[in-house]
Amino acid sequence: IGNMLQPLYLGIPCILMSPEAFLQKPFRWLQAISRYKATTSGGPNFAYDLCVNKITDEQRASLDLSSWQVAFNGAEPVRADTMERFTAAFADCGFRREAFYPCYGMAETTLIVSGGGVSAQPILQNLQKQALEQNRVVSALRQKDDSQTLVGSGQCLPELEIVIANPQTMEPCQPNEVGEIWVSGPSVAQGYWNRQEQTEQTFRAQLRNTKAGRFLRTGDLGF
């Protein structure tokens, strides 16, 4: 959807690469961005780690990543240290930290649910680990062993609604309380094909008391 239907809709060139080709040699991905002057490309967080770990200094010297405006990072937890390592490794190739685009989405929502502003710096929050384990969001004054840095996934798309709900009580969470991410909007699928029971449980959640909904239960935690 994001990398095939969108270019067709916009009438712009799109270069495709198989996941196998990337995994065999991560350099191929950045080489393609450099060769074709790509402006938008991305992948899961681990893809950026692979590039840092596998691409040699000699290979880096041949790259020009200055055209890369949106480096989307999603499909799994986005890690602050990965972004910092990648930026440091490829800054001399023209890569800019503000190109990183942490985002959140899933197939059931026709891809994207939230994302940051283009060219905006990723938003980081340093939080207390012990509080997170208790589903509470408490800021840590500085980075240390008992803290954890989380990367924000931007703002909800205008046509979508996100609520954070307690998965046990089905009630809205309080501010600064971790809960399950629920999504509602026109891009949310109607359900799973020929799976009525699973569709009812996943796509038709309602908040207790308010009866607001129907929401898609993502199974992911957020605040």
Locations of the language-model features?
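Conserved AMP-binding/adenylation subdomain of ANL enzymes
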Residues: 1-39, 50, 54-58, 161
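Conserved ATP-binding/catalytic segment of the ANL
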Residues: 150-163, 167-176, 180-223
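Hydrophobic alpha-helical scaffolding
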Residues: 16-22, 36-41, 72-79, 151-153, ...
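Gly/Ser/Thr-rich phosphate-binding loop
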Residues: 10-12, 38-42, 54-147, 161-163, ...
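Alpha-helical scaffold elements adjacent to nucleotide-binding pockets in ATP/GTP-utilizing enzyme cores
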Residues: 3, 28-32, 46-54, 81-89, ...
